[in-house]
Amino acid sequence: MSDIAERVKKIVIDHLGVDADKVVESASFIDDLGADSLDTVELVMAFEEEFGVEIPDDAADSILTVGDAVKFIEKAQA
């Protein structure tokens, strides 16, 4: 797992209080990890702060899984 993926995973665990083994690339924030719309907004803000990237609203709406977040951040930092 990449450094970005590890950091995303830690943020998700800290914000949602879920078990580490549930935070896999294919895990949906809402369907698999129990996040609500406020949680997803807070996650996006935490990703922006941690990685120093801006995630526009339209992009945030397409970040539905842990893997989506990792891919967006990797692309934004490239």
Swiss-Prot record:
Residues 2-77 form the Carrier domain. Keywords: Cytoplasm, Fatty acid biosynthesis, Fatty acid metabolism, Lipid biosynthesis, Lipid metabolism, Phosphopantetheine, Phosphoprotein. The modification O-(pantetheine 4'-phosphoryl)serine is found at residue 37. It is found in: Cytoplasm. GO terms for biological process: lipid A biosynthetic process. SMART domains: PKS_PP. It comes from the Bacteria. PANTHER family: ACYL CARRIER PROTEIN (PTHR20863), CARRIER DOMAIN-CONTAINING PROTEIN (PTHR20863:SF76). This is Acyl carrier protein AcpP. It comes from Rhizobium leguminosarum.
